[in-house]
Amino acid sequence: MVVLATVLAAGSAQADRLDDIKKAGVLRVAAFDSNPPFGFIDQKSKQIVGLDVDYAKALANKLGVTLELRSTNPANRIPLLTSGKVDFVLANFTITEERAKQLDFSIPYFSSGQQFLAKKGTLSSPDQLNGLRIAADKGTTNEIVLRRDFPKAVVVSFDDTPFAFTALRNGNVQAVTQDGPKLVSLLANLPDKEAYEIPPFTVSNDYMGVGIPKGEARLVAFVNETLLELEGNGKAAAIYDAWFGPNTPQPLPRLFKIGDKK
């Protein structure tokens, strides 16, 4: 049994979630459905697509199983994984020591810095963050960093990024904080994007990994090996270029490669 194997993994044999996935023929993955370009609903196909989804597809293909996506928001990622409702989380999931107490992570497959989106002229340096009303996704490292490092900022938490953007456009907050690449993508799709800007500074650098159930050593090894293989054969670069390459609405140079940080 999966639950029993997980409980016993720390004390004896390895857990066998990898075998369970192969036997079931399905890989269940939690992904965002409203956070482009990492995970969002394609208006034509009505399917979840994005950078994280492409990595999920690559993992499922390597296993030779069907991919089953489950929508999640930032606050629900860990509960979905620890309750056994999904096998992996691929949802712009920042690797932290606190989260690693509850789950395991793969090696990083993406890196970004925490930035801000505000109306032009509102924000130009980190010193100005204290005193502003700033929207953040609930339960994210962005929220944690903001509360810890800028105690005089008024942090307003939302279940998901689109709600934060609505608050910004309605004037309920003065800025939104998120990973830089995600902000670039969201800004590109705003109808009044000329009124907003992303100031050229970061307050932290984050690494994203695949969330994996705690104690599943074989599963971690499989994911890490597959990610390194994708980097080596050029498929990781192709995935990045599909969402951040020169022909996309939000071009960003690829500065981080899988394997740069273990």
Language-model regions: role of each:
Residues A15-N92:
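Extracytoplasmic small-molecule ligand-binding "clamshell" domains
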Residues G25-F32, V49, P126-T140, V154:
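Short loop->beta-strand "edge-of-pocket" segments that line small-molecule binding or catalytic clefts
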Residues L27-R28, G64-T66, T72, S83-A91, ...:
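Alpha-to-beta junction loops
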Residues V53, E68-P79, G121, K138, ...:
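Short helix-initiation/N-cap motifs at beta->coil->alpha
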Residues V53-K62, T122, L132-R133, T140-T141, ...:
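Extended ligand-binding regions for polar small-molecule ligands
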Residues K57, N61, T66-Q128, F201-T202:
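Acidic, polar ligand-binding/catalytic clefts
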Residues F110-L117, G180, V184-L227, P246-K262:
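Periplasmic-binding protein-like
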Residues V145-F158, E194, L227-K262:
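Ligand-binding clefts/hinges and TM-proximal coupling segments of bilobed small-molecule sensing domains
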